[in-house]
């Protein structure tokens, strides 16, 4: 409810959607759902990026960030960024069926650090393949700590 009554919040989501055929089959996950009731201050503050294909990878997610989410963040100028980090899109996860590498998670977080004076909270949401979840979380932490990201690193479970 906080989202519907607060004009100072933006909710941005990247979801596997498959034209509403993927769980949880919510109409609210589609691109044209833009937030609460029109008479609430939050109308237009919900940004959904529904993914209608599986097996999308780093370049797809980086494009979503660079072409959609980062320009919105630049315009909105947030005071803080909270990330619900679902690693379902990680390579090897049976639920997400995507191909995002652990290094890409680090890169995405690193790109968000340019906003809100680097004030970012990251909360684990999901991911069902422990190897890619662990590596993705490690790369996320490395980015938060300002460590150099090894984008060429190869992971044992991927070979």
Locate each region found by the language model.
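A general "terminal functional-core" signal
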Residues: 1-159
């Amino acid at each position: 409810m906080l989202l519907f009554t607060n004009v100072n919040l933006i909710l941005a989501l990247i979801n596997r959607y498959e034209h509403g055929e993927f769980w949880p089959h919510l109409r609210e996950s589609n691109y044209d759902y833009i937030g609460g009731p029109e008479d609430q201050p939050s109308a237009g503050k919900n940004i959904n990026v529904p993914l209608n294909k599986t097996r999308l990878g780093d370049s797809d997610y980086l494009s979503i960030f660079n072409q959609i989410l980062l320009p919105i963040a630049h315009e909105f100028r947030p005071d803080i960024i909270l990330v619900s980090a679902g690693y379902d899109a990680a390579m090897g996860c049976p639920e997400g069926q995507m191909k995002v590498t652990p290094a890409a998670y680090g890169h995405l977080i690193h790109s968000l650090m340019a906003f809100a004076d680097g004030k970012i909270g990251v909360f684990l949401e999901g991911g069902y393949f422990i190897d890619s979840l662990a590596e993705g979380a490690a790369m996320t932490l490395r980015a938060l700590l300002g460590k150099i990201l090894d984008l060429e690193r190869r992971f044992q479970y991927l070979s």
